[in-house]
Amino acid sequence: MEEAKQNLSNIEQVIWIDLHTGYGPRYQMSVVNSQYEKESTKEIINNINYPLVLGLNADDFYEIDGDMIEMIYRINEKSSNPANLYATCFEFGTLGDSTLNTIESLKAILFENSNHFQNQSSKFEKYSHKLIKEQFLPSEEKWKEKAYSDFKQAIEGIFKYKKLIK
């Protein structure tokens, strides 16, 4: 992370976006902010004109401590010349956020790990590969188009709010 330290100390304004696929509603990308973000979730929603902005806590999303954006905020905070930083995560939901979909997600991870650590039948391997692929990059064209549209809307909203574009 030495590079991040160097870059953050020499740049006036930084927009850091960590991209994830997996959790959340299937057809709605979530913007997941750090617990260190100074603005409230409501302010961010209004300022970037994006409908689904969450904080990084159990009330909004699922509680995380120690992920990339948290680390970037801590590095920046310790810098002798901190950047004007906005670090966030774009979470592209792939399976959906129901209890059943969460179980399917867990199943995909377990099956993939099982394949990795122990030889399985070719049928099991194919099934497991299909599950894990759909969890991280759905094949459905509608999903891909919506993910692109959401990404574009959120990135434009952030860049306009931070006055990087008009």
Where on the chain are the PLM-derived regions?
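C-terminal accessory segments enriched in acidic
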Residues: M1-K166
